[in-house]
Amino acid sequence: MKKLYDAVQRFCARHPRFGIPNLMLYIVAGNVIVYLLMMFTQANDANALAFLTLNTSAVLKGELWRIITYVFVPTSSGIFWLLISLYFYYWIGSTLERQWGTAKFNLYYISGVLLTAVGVLIASLISGQSYTVAGSYYVNLSMFFAFAFLFPDTQVLLFFIIPVKMKWLAYLDGALFAYDVVRCLMAGNWGGALLPIIALLNFAVFIWPEVHYMA
């Protein structure tokens, strides 16, 4: 992991202009546009945006755009919670970009997107079933863990009332993440257990070595 981490650091130092500045603004805008298309076309059923989701069988048939477009599928069908989640992850992502620089943040986000695709492929090969991912849940979770590591004492209002530090929310999400993995393993669902682990490998590459540097 340390060698990969050092390679990332060198790349970012040599190519500081790599990537798309304010990337999260485009991700948020894409989610809003897709949501509006759903609303105006009354395409609210589960199959309406099937051409955007990350599906193993479809990708292997040449529909390579799905490797990227799945992150634009809204994670919530309710406008209120969609706007709240988009604002929250825009805040997290833009803060990480200011902290790391555009190059490193773009690498982190893009690697999360691609690792999720790799995880879906491996899970499908192991299980013999075609996995589908709609929305950027794992990418967002990876961003959240990175933010909580860098800014553990930052407070947010849980349910708009209760002040909670990011590190405690990260511990809770980490516990739920581990529970889901263990539950899949106990059920013999090896693909379902590997998918989230592979999807969050960018956290291990970008963040975990910093734990040792800080120790």
Q: Residue spans of the language-model regions?
A:
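Generic alpha-helical transmembrane segments
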Residues: T116-A117, A134-P152
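N-terminal TM1-TM2 helical hairpin plus the immediately adjacent luminal interfacial "cap"
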Residues: C12, P16-V113, A117-V118, S124, ...
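Hydrophobic core segments of alpha-helical transmembrane domains in multi-pass membrane proteins
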Residues: L83-F88, S136-F145, I161, G191-P209
